[in-house]
Amino acid sequence: MNTIKVRDIEIGAGAPKIIVPIVGVTKDDIIAEAKTFDSTPVDMVEWRVDWFENVFEFDKVEEVLKELRDALGNIPILMTFRTSKEGGEKAIEPEAYARLNVKAAQTGYVDFVDVEIFTGDEIVKKIIDGVHAAGARVIASNHDFFKTPAQSDIVYRLRKMQDMGADIPKIAVMPQNKRDVLTLLSATEEMVTDYADRPIITMSMAGTGVISRLCGEVFGSSMTFGAAKKASAPGQMGVNDLSTVLDLLHKAM
């Protein structure tokens, strides 16, 4: 499997890298939180732009991106508009979604954008090609907040993301029981062992699935999400506790 080097981190090598989300509503809240990350074990910051009150005014989005880049120094930025159909704050038309993501990449301030893989193949390809042309990378994603699909279906979705040209495929699913967590972990191992030529991100959500956020180095998930302030999904641990556990597991391997 190939690793991905972005700024000062290498994704896919060593312990899973920690992504910390920012879910502020106002520009002041967003930038204030970003300025607290000096003392936080964060490898990448995800700006959940769907929470931003002015998300549909691109000049204001660009202002925040510029100030985020200044505040975060060399920490990579992932910009994510999580749509309401996949658990996000707002709905958006596919063409507007494409424009937002490509224009964000063209600013030069973001390192990754998140693209929901089931937005429609034509739109997804347009975004991936546009983001790559701008010199940024893509995390393709899929979220099921209600269930855990069959192992074969999880692997199919991750392979589709890879085949579409995403730099990092990502899937998050909701367990109904402990066996569902095993299904997610088994799918992760299968994908990494048999199909993946790039890093992937997988997780089982909520308290039942929290182990999946910790054992990525064992099963093959290269990044994990931790909360510095407000969690953006069920089951996210505090970033300091998460970092401690990841370090302990890494030293034992």
Model-predicted regions and their roles:
Residues 1-10, 251-253:
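Short, Lys/Arg-enriched, disordered terminal segments
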Residues 1-5, 60-61, 183-184, 206-207:
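Short amphipathic alpha-helical surface micro-motifs
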Residues 2-4, 13-133, 143-147:
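Active-site beta->alpha loop and helix N-cap motifs at the rims of alpha/beta catalytic domains
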Residues 6-9, 68, 96, 151-162:
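Short N-terminal signal/transit or membrane-insertion segments
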Residues 9-13, 70, 105-107, 162-163, ...:
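Solvent-exposed alpha-helices and their adjacent loops that cap or buttress functional pockets
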Residues 112, 117-253:
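Catalytic alpha/beta core domains of metabolic enzymes, predominantly
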